Amino acid sequence: HYDAVFSFNYSAAVSTNCNRHNIPYISWIYDSPLLTLYSYTITNPCNYIFLFDSEQYLQLKNGGINTVYYMPLAVNTARLDRMPMNTMVHQVFDSDVSFVGSMYNEKGNFYERLENISPYVKGYLDAVINAQQHIYGANFLEDVLSPDIIKAIQEITPYTPNKDGIETPSYVYANYFLARKVTQNERFEILKAVSDHFTTKLYTHNPTPELPDVINKGPIDFYDNM
C-alpha cells in the first residue's frame, strides 16, 4: 500500500487511478499555463495540487476547485551552497546581464502555424499581440477572440479539447498561440535593448542571429550549473 503518489506537474491518469484506490495524489506544478489542470479530474478528492502561479490558483479556487493550493517554487539551498565558486566559474558565467529560458523561436512554433490565415485575421491578431505587449497587469487575449476569429483559427489549426478537459479553444489559442508570441517579442526586444549597453549572456536552445550583441551560450544544465 502506498501512502501517497507524487508527481511534478499534473497527470489526469494518475489522479484517476489514485482516486479509484483512495490514495492521496500530490502534484507540484512548475509550468504555467498547464493544460492538464483543465481536466475535470482535478476535482477528485484525492488531489493535493500545489501551484506557484497565484493568478491561476485564484482562478481555480474562486471557481470552486478545493483541491488546489498556492505554494511558491522552492529551491534546494543546501545543494546550491555546495556548488564551487572559483575563478573558472566566474570566467565562464560572469556577465552584466544573464537570461536563462526559451526564446520561443523554435521552427514551427504555434504562432507560425497561422501563417496561411487570412490577412484580415492575421492583422487583427498582430494588433492584439502588440496591444498586449504595452499593457501590464491585465491579460485580455482570451477576451478579444471573437467567435469569428476562433472559427478562422480553427480552420487553419484545429483544436479538439481533451475528452476529460473543460478548456475552451479560446483559452488554448490565447495562452499557447498568442501569449507565447507576446513573450517571444518581449524577450527579443528587452535583450536587444539591454545588450546595446551591457554584456549580455543568453542560455537557450536555439540560435538568435537577430541579437548580434547577445552572447548566446546555448542551453545550460539546470542541475550542475545553476
Stretches found by the model and what they are:
Residues N66-T67, P72-M226:
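Nucleotide-sugar donor-binding catalytic core of glycosyltransferases
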